[in-house]
Design a protein with these regions (language model features):
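Beta1/beta-strand and adjacent pyrophosphate-binding region of the FAD-binding site
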Residues: 7
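C-terminal cap of thioredoxin/glutaredoxin-like
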Residues: 4, 13-16, 20-33, 114, ...
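Structural alpha/beta surface segment adjacent to cysteine/selenocysteine redox centers
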Residues: 12, 18-126, 215
């Protein structure tokens, strides 16, 4: 039986996307899956579906800050929360970063994983502004891209090709029924199965016939 294609639609402004990203990376050599990263734009999904940021409901915002801290510890992902996180999110557009990630995916896909991880590290661990070109270039070079490749990707973000690719990927997520991120789509038994949230990966395993071994599984020997 062939590997099950599992697509992860994500935006680096979403901390729960980071949790799903890291856990799926851990499982890709344990489960019989073909993991595909699909950088998309959360702002576009929120706008198209009429979804609202969690902080719009104060009590929910308070809960999420506590939940994120617990989840980060449980998933062993270095998300560092602070009281001003929602203000940082509302004051930061991830569009430039996601276009840069998309441009890199189109030209040098081998850097997609480390680059995405580096953006999460900078926004959620180091609390940097990932919308600024100098921080974007620094993230790219930390992820292994040369100065030349980084500059080329930065120049590409304003091109119709990159803009259209990001729009298309976001539209695909919406087509599958996404209303937020992370959106995980498993192509199993002849149809797509959508899972929303980093806490649905155990259910994903159940649907595709794989065993859940916790968020930090021991790799196969």
């Amino acid at each position: 039986m062939g590997r099950t294609v599992v697509e992860l639609f994500y935006d680096v402004i979403s901390p729960y996307s980071w949790l799903a990203f890291e856990v799926l990376c851990r499982y890709r050599h344990i489960w019989n899956i073909d993991l595909r990263f699909r950088p998309a734009f959360l702002g576009g999904i929120m706008q198209q579906t009429g979804n609202k940021p969690p902080a719009m409901l104060p009590k929910r915002g308070e809960y999420i800050l506590k939940d994120m801290k617990r989840m980060a510890k449980y998933y062993q992902v270095p998300v560092h929360t602070s009281a001003d996180d929602f203000q940082r999110i509302l004051g930061t557009s991830s569009l430039t970063a996601m276009r840069f990630i998309t441009a890199t995916d189109m030209t040098n896909p081998q850097y997609l994983e480390p680059l995405s991880r580096e953006f999460w590290m900078r926004f959620w661990s180091q609390h940097e502004d990932i919308s600024q070109p100098e921080n974007i270039l620094a993230a790219a070079q930390q992820a292994g891209l040369s100065a030349e490749l980084s500059q080329k990707a930065l120049e590409m973000i304003s091109t119709p090709t990159v803009k259209d690719r990001l729009k298309e990927t976001t539209a695909e997520a919406l087509k599958y029924g996404a209303f937020g991120m992370p959106a995980v789509v498993a192509h199993y038994d002849g149809k797509p199965h959508l899972f929303f949230g980093s806490d649905r990966l155990e259910l994903l395993g159940s649907i595709i016939g794989e065993k859940w071994l916790g968020p930090v599984p021991s790799p196969k020997l």
